[in-house]
Every structure is written in structure tokens, then in C-alpha cells.
Amino acid sequence: MKVLVINCGSSSLKYQVIDMENNSVLAKGNFKRIGEKESFLEHKINGKMYVINEYAPNHEVALKCIFDELLNKEHPALNSLQDINAVGHRIVHGGEYFNSSVLVTEDVIKKITDCGKFAPLHNYAAVQGIKACIELLPNVPQVTVFDTAFHQTMPKESFIYPIPYEYYE
């Protein structure tokens, strides 16, 4: 099983392709400066770093470039995109909606967007990445993993006590 894990920031997209059978990283990288003319991809495979200067106006274009590199005939990490069995998305803020990882649905996307006010530099970019993956890998399960999920498992008094109650309301 091969899993693509992505972390979309406001102007970057970090990723790893992990082979779960032998717990190895097949490729990893970081697409930097998304939305700027000087955007570029740092792609590492087999210990060698490749730098690809490519204009990516948005996360979808960046993801397409990453997929091109994963399939690069000179140094392929994958034989085809069908080799990807699942995609994991790191999400900074899930609000009170999520206390564990969940499969992506339209409702999940809406709730991540709703929580964008708490993490505007990350959640909105993450939604772009999710939508791009759904479009480019339509039959692959997409899973979201929330940084805030741990806090949903705390006793209510533990997360309310340190702040004035009206902030919680």
C-alpha cells in the first residue's frame, strides 16, 4: 500500500509518498512559493534532491507538477498514479467538529472551510489541496488528520478553565 501524505500551507505544499509494506519513503518534497513567479519544487528521491523551477499559481498546479515528478521516467517513484492507494491531508484546525481522522466528504470540506477563520493560512489551502486530489485522484480514498483532534478528547474543564468562559461561548 502506498500513501501520499500532503500538508498544504498558504504558499507551500509538502508531501511524502510512503510505502506502508516496508515503511519506506519513496519520495518527498516541498513545493515553495506557490502563487509567486519564482515558485519551485524541491523533490527528493533515492537520496538525491531535484529542484524544478515551475510557476504554480495555485495548489492544483503544484500538485500536477509533483505528480509529474513522481512519474518522471529518469527517476520514477511510482509506475503510475494508480499506485497511490490513499491520500492523507494534514489539517491544522478542525474546531469542535472532529476528534479523530475522517474520510473526506462534502460535509467534511465544508466544516474545514468553516474552521478557516481559526487557521486562515492553512485551512483554506488545505481545502484547495483536498479538492485538487479529488479531481486528480478521483477513486482514491482521502483522509483528513486534524492537529486539534487531541484537544477534543480532553475533559471539558481542562480546555475551558484557562480562559474566560465567554470566550468559549
State the predicted function of each range.
Residues 1-4:
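Extreme N-terminal starter segment of soluble prokaryotic enzymes
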Residues 37-85, 115, 129:
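Conserved active-site "lid/cap" helical segment
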Residues 123-124, 130-169:
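Phosphate-binding/catalytic loop of phosphoryl-transfer enzymes
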Residues 12-56:
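Short glycine-rich, Thr/Ser-proximal phosphate-binding strand/loop in the N-terminal lobe
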Residues 57-61, 65, 103, 107, ...:
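Conserved active-site and cofactor/substrate-binding residues in soluble primary-metabolism enzymes
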Residues 70, 76-122, 143, 150-160:
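Short beta-strand-loop/turn "lid" adjacent to the catalytic site in phosphate-handling enzymes
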Residues 21, 26, 81, 137-139:
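Short, well-ordered coil/turn elements that cap or connect secondary structure elements
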Residues 6-11:
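A short acidic Gly-Thr/Ser loop motif
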